[in-house]
Amino acid sequence: MSGTDKVRVNVSQTAQTPLHTSAKLPKVGVLLVNLGTPDGTSYGPMRRYLAEFLSDRRVIEWSRLIWYPILYGIVLNTRPRRSGRLYDRIWNHENNESPLRTYTRAQGEKLAKALSDQPNVVVDWAMRYGQPSIESITDRLLQQGCERIVIFPLYPQYSATTTATVNDKFFEALMKKRFMPAIRTVPSYEAEPVYIDALARSVEKHLATLSFKPEVILTSYHGIPKSYSDKGDPYRQQCLETTRLLRERLGLGEDEMRATFQSRFGPEEWLQPYTDETVKELAKNGVKSVAVLNPGFVADCLETVDEIGNEAAEEFLENGGENFSHIPCLNDSEEGMKVIETLVRRELLGWV
């Protein structure tokens, strides 16, 4: 046999030997993240939560030289007790936690069950402020062998004060790690058909349970300072787009469904119209029946259950209104879980 023949045989034998004897899909983590919650309603837990939340530069953009004396000298000495009393009105005393934590846990558990056909996917959940922290759950996903992670900030409309700060905190946690997994972030979904359809179905189901027909339905979103929007934050436009699409889906006119903004804090002008002023104005102008939903919240929390369900209702009724109803958030309902699962499965394409 010639030298050339020997080379040909060796190449042929090598070509038939696979580079990998087995193909094992890497584990993929899916991390759901919502805004956060205190661990309790007493002064200590409330102060810790508010300190973390209100120290975030994405949330309060003022100079630290101006803001910190106000925060630590005034706000954190007065607001924890007031906020604690409000949280106590909606607290899940059976589980000793806020509704937001209850619903976010349920969303994580139901998503894990829905994705059980993907054995290499690990689902978990965290809070931007409070517990469980993004860093602790990121550690847990990495310890379970996740080489790829989909992070899902649970905000339908993007804002630097919400979506961006979740991503900031996630990457900050990874900065401490030697190994950096591959990352995908779920974008805002303010106009996704599955989301608009879920909102429409939730409205229709709720209205069917009422003994009255609302003359006006308000879509109330958490506000942000107007200056943030002026600097380029797309939040306002995305909120208005969600309301426009929902209005069209339900066949309502502009006077029958209106977008408003709630939860303003501090002396700055925030996005308008304000929800509390709008319900008061509607009542004084002779509107007798109103319903309010919160499309920007994927789970009920203090801002929806208490601020809308109690405070806005009281404002409306005290000024001449007769019927008020708060439409619950999507929470872990079938419609809400369909939204989350659809968006997660899209981001998992090519990874599972």
UniProtKB/Swiss-Prot annotation:
It is an enzyme of class 4 (lyase). One of its GO terms (cellular component) is cytoplasm. It catalyses: heme b + 2 H(+) = protoporphyrin IX + Fe(2+). Its EC number is 4.98.1.1. PROSITE patterns: FERROCHELATASE (PS00534). Keywords: Cytoplasm, Heme biosynthesis, Iron, Lyase, Metal-binding, Porphyrin biosynthesis. CDD domains: Ferrochelatase_C, Ferrochelatase_N. Fe cation binds at H222, E303. The keyword Lyase applies. It comes from the Bacteria. It is found in: Cytoplasm. GO terms for biological process: heme biosynthetic process. GO terms for molecular function: ferrochelatase activity; metal ion binding. Its main location: cytoplasm. Pathway: Porphyrin-containing compound metabolism; protoheme biosynthesis; protoheme from protoporphyrin-IX: step 1/1. PANTHER family: FERROCHELATASE (PTHR11108), FERROCHELATASE, MITOCHONDRIAL (PTHR11108:SF1). Catalyzes the ferrous insertion into protoporphyrin IX. Belongs to the ferrochelatase family. NCBIfam families: hemH (TIGR00109). This is Ferrochelatase. It comes from Brucella ovis (strain ATCC 25840 / 63/290 / NCTC 10512). The lineage of its organism: Bacteria, Pseudomonadati, Pseudomonadota, Alphaproteobacteria, Hyphomicrobiales.
